[in-house]
C-alpha cells in the first residue's frame, strides 16, 4: 500500500534511484495505491547524466510493494521493498529496461510494455 509521502525505489534505467509519491491517481479521495496503480511521483535521488533530474514530477506505475497482492487462490505475493517504473506523458515507460520481478497483475493493455521488459513475471 503506497500513500502520499511514501518513498519507492525505481525499477528501470531512467536515471532515478528513489522517488516519493505525491498523489495517488484515480479519484479525489483515493488514499492508497497497490500493484498496477498509477501514482504521481517526484524524483528524490537521481544518477548523473540520467534521463530524469532530481525534483522533476512524473507519473509512475507501482510494480512491487511490501504489502503484496492477494491472488484469487488465496496466495500472497510479497516483495522486500516498494518499487515503481516511471512513465512519460503518453503513459509509456521512460527507461528501456526493467529490473527485478513484476507480478501478473500488470498484464493490462496499457502496461504490457513493462511486463515484456521485465526479466521475471510472478
Curated annotation (Swiss-Prot):
Coiled-coil residues: none
Keyword annotations from UniProtKB, A to Z: Ribonucleoprotein, Ribosomal protein, RNA-binding, rRNA-binding
GO biological process, one term: translation
Pfam families: Ribosomal_L14
GO cellular component: cytosolic large ribosomal subunit
The UniProt record lists the keyword Ribosomal protein: yes
Highest taxon in the source lineage: Bacteria
Molecular function, one GO term: large ribosomal subunit rRNA binding
InterPro entries, alphabetized: Ribosomal_uL14, Ribosomal_uL14_bac-type, Ribosomal_uL14_CS, Ribosomal_uL14_sf
Free-text function comment from the UniProt entry: Binds to 23S rRNA. Forms part of two intersubunit bridges in the 70S ribosome.
Assembly: Part of the 50S ribosomal subunit. Forms a cluster with proteins L3 and L19. In the 70S ribosome, L14 and L19 interact and together make contacts with the 16S rRNA in bridges B5 and B8.
Family: Belongs to the universal ribosomal protein uL14 family.
Protein name per UniProt: Large ribosomal subunit protein uL14
Organism from which the protein derives: Xylella fastidiosa (strain Temecula1 / ATCC 700964)
Amino acid at each position: 500500500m503506497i500513500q502520499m509521502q511514501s518513498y519507492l525505489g525505481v525499477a528501470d534505467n531512467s536515471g532515478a534511484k528513489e522517488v516519493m509519491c505525491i498523489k495517488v491517481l484515480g479519484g479525489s479521495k483515493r488514499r492508497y495505491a497497490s500493484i498496477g496503480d498509477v501514482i504521481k511521483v517526484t524524483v528524490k535521488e537521481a544518477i548523473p547524466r540520467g534521463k530524469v533530474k532530481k525534483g522533476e514530477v512524473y507519473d509512475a506505475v507501482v510494480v512491487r510493494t511490501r504489502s503484496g497482492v492477494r491472488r484469487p487462490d488465496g496466495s500472497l505475493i510479497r516483495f522486500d521493498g516498494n518499487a515503481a517504473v516511471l512513465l512519460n506523458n503518453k503513459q509509456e515507460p521512460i527507461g528501456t529496461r526493467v529490473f527485478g520481478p513484476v507480478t501478473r497483475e500488470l498484464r493490462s493493455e496499457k502496461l504490457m510494455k513493462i511486463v515484456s521488459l521485465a526479466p521475471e513475471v510472478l
